[in-house]
Curated annotation (Swiss-Prot):
Name of the encoding gene: cbiL
One example of a Gene Ontology biological process annotation: methylation
Record InterPro entries: 4pyrrol_Mease, 4pyrrol_Methylase_sf, 4pyrrole_Mease_sub1, 4pyrrole_Mease_sub2, CobI/CbiL, CobI/CbiL/CobIJ_dom, Uropor_MeTrfase_CS
Protein name per its UniProtKB record: Probable cobalt-precorrin-2 C(20)-methyltransferase
Keyword Oxidoreductase: no
EC category name: transferase
Amino acid sequence: MNKLVKKVYGVGVGVGDKKLLTLKALEVLKKVDKIFVPVSKKGKKSIAYEIIKDYVDGKNIEELLFPMIKDKERLKKYWENALEKVLKEDGEVAIITIGDPTLYSTFSYVWKLLKERGVEVEIVNGISSIFASAAALNIPLVEGDEKLCILPQGKDLEKYIDEFDTIIIMKTKNLNEKLSVIKNRDDYIIGLVKRATFEDEKVVIGKLDEINFDEFNDYLSLAIIKRFKR
């Protein structure tokens, strides 16, 4: 008879600082029978695992390979391979992810497949890079009736720049080009954060022509664009 995992937890482990790991996440990680750790390449260090490793000494750990490629058909094979690994486990397991499992997370793809198989899934929230970056910049994201927009890689920024008070851009590669839509405007300020809450965190806030964007051309960088109300 084929085994079917009893329960799967999608656990957000935050963004870097181990002290930001939630009590609920620690509770789940300590009680599960196995912890699955997503990696983008075999042999590559997992940021998520580095965050939790001091708390899970002696636990059963297994890697899940999710390469950083855009071809969804190729990626689907890796998701399905991960699913089969998870399904064959007895008891309860956790799949960890940096940030929060509900926001641009690798876990969401496996979540869909698990739900299709009728597996019980519970999501354990983690602190997202969005909130960690706002804290690093020491600014509120939105207040009152202000509107917030999240854009992956700044896609279609020109469509939303005048509609929202705050725009979050996840993954800031080639951001300088995308921000040309506000080049000659003085009603916006830009905050950039690289590796929020890590020891080598880098933060800058200012106008477009005051920022060296090359320093933030990184997978773990994020931009917050805020409009001033006159």
